[in-house]
Amino acid sequence: MFEQNLTSEALTVTTVTSQDQITQKPLRDSVKASLKNYLAQLNGQEVDDLYELVLAEVEQPLLDTIMQYTRGNQTRAATMMGINRGTLRKKLKKYGMN
């Protein structure tokens, strides 16, 4: 039986410095750094939709990439994402990707 051994550590961001050094760090580190940067720029301004903002920033490229990978096969995409196909269809519609 096939056993999946990929973990969230496989989700990395690769960067190249000005000295052509290549570094990889977990996606979560990049998300955390982006959030810290965003919060620092608020200058005390209230925000009430941060969860939705972050979710949209991650969810839309996730959907786009998975749909390309599965060549538009919604059943396969939903299975890969671990969600119901109906839920996938709603998310695709939300982002105008249907």
UniProtKB/Swiss-Prot annotation:
UniProt similarity note: Belongs to the transcriptional regulatory Fis family.
Taxon lineage: Bacteria, Pseudomonadati, Pseudomonadota, Gammaproteobacteria, Vibrionales
Protein keywords: Activator, DNA-binding, Transcription, Transcription regulation
InterPro entries assigned: Fis_DNA-bd, Homeodomain-like_sf, HTH_Fis, Trans_regulatory_Fis
Pfam families: HTH_8 (PF02954)
DNA-binding region: 74-93
NCBIfam families reported for this sequence: PRK00430.1
The name this protein goes by in its record: DNA-binding protein Fis
Organism of provenance: Photobacterium profundum (strain SS9)
Subunit-structure text: Homodimer.
Annotated function: Activates ribosomal RNA transcription. Plays a direct role in upstream activation of rRNA promoters.
Record carries keyword Cell membrane: no
Gene name as annotated: fis
Gene Ontology MF term list: DNA-binding transcription factor activity; sequence-specific DNA binding
